[in-house]
């Protein structure tokens, strides 16, 4: 060999993550990562890569009144452990307003060519349940509509800017308030 060894993959321990989650994250993100408060995200079933990205962003550069102080003291291993734990937890689906969800489904699947809104499904998967783990695009199914709405509004107003190459800011800038409400309801009602 040439004397170089490949770096060992960084892997989280779900059991250690559960202990940390129950001590630090439970109050806001709920049992098993299913937040009971609609403005706080559900973490259950999320890609571990996405959770790691978000926690590291909070630790390094993303200012957030609630999350930055919670993430700062976490070690890199604790971040991996939390991500591994939440990724294995089942999501609790929500109910959606049927009329809004129908409009949101169309926008999610096909976008709005008239205003240049891209289809959400292009990055987040055909039913919101897949996302793309390697690209760190999140799973969106069963997420609280209030949280999704707030997130899209923050991207639209450039209050949130941790999206690669401004992808979400660009897409959200083209969304109307009605479209944000509709796609948020659609995603909340998905159970995958």
From Swiss-Prot:
UniProt-annotated binding residues for heme c 2: 120, 123-124
Record GO terms (molecular function): electron transfer activity; heme binding; iron ion binding
GO biological process: electron transport chain; heme transport
Binding of heme c 1, residues: 25, 28-29
Record's comment on post-translational modification: Binds 2 heme c groups covalently per subunit.
Database matches in InterPro entries: Cyt_c-like_dom (IPR009056), Cyt_c-like_dom_sf (IPR036909), Cyt_C_IC (IPR008168), Cytochrome_c4-like (IPR024167), Cytochrome_c_Oxidase_Subunit (IPR050597)
Physiological role: Diheme, high potential cytochrome c believed to be an intermediate electron donor in an anaerobic electron transport chain.
Protein name: Cytochrome c4
Organism listed in the record: Thiocapsa roseopersicina
